[in-house]
């Protein structure tokens, strides 16, 4: 499992109610289910990732977070997790506002496009790197916004 997922899981309290927005293949959800809280569900756009979640026995809703988060009542969850997904939204500010509305606490992580390894790769090879965290070629990416820590 990605180190980032362990760091996120450490922030979640035992037996809390959790929504994982853009849950991907369910790797983080599965870890949380087995170790922290059984009351977790995800929302995911990709049909293939939804299938992977279902195969793992996870509860997942097919949906677009930019539209479908509005359907949840205020303070529905103790934690709302958005991992490596914010940069792919057309209106990230609206998504963040929805996370704060439906969750008592929001945990957000982003890919750091300014990381020294990314910049070094760009300098030496002239291309954006393709890695586990940045798995797409620059011309075929869902990332609409490039994020850095500062």
Task: List PLM regions with ranges.
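Conserved alpha-helix/loop element of class I SAM-dependent methyltransferases that forms part
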Residues: 1-15
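Conserved SAM/SAH-binding loop
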Residues: 25
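Short conserved loop adjoining the S-adenosyl-L-methionine
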Residues: 68-74
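A short SAM/SAH-binding and catalytic strip from SAM-dependent methyltransferases
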Residues: 79-90
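S-adenosyl-L-methionine-dependent methyltransferase catalytic module, highlighting the catalytic core
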Residues: 93-101, 105-150
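Class I SAM-dependent methyltransferase SAM/SAH-binding core
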Residues: 31-68
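Conserved beta-strand/loop positions that form the S-adenosyl-L-methionine
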Residues: 21
């Amino acid at each position: 499992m990605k180190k980032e997922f362990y760091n996120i899981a450490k922030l979640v309290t035992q037996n809390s109610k959790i929504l994982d927005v853009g849950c991907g293949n369910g790797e983080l959800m599965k870890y949380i289910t087995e170790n922290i809280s059984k009351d977790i569900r995800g929302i995911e756009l990709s049909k293939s990732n939804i299938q992977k979640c279902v195969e793992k026995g996870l509860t997942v809703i097919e949906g677009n977070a930019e539209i479908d988060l509005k359907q949840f009542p205020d303070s529905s969850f103790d934690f709302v997790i958005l991992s490596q997904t914010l940069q792919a939204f057309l209106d990230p500010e609206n998504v963040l506002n929805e996370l704060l509305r439906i969750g008592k606490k929001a945990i957000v992580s982003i890919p750091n496009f300014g990381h020294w390894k990314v910049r070094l790769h760009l300098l030496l090879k002239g291309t954006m790197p393709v890695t586990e965290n940045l798995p797409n070629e620059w011309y075929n990416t869902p990332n609409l916004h490039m994020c850095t820590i500062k």
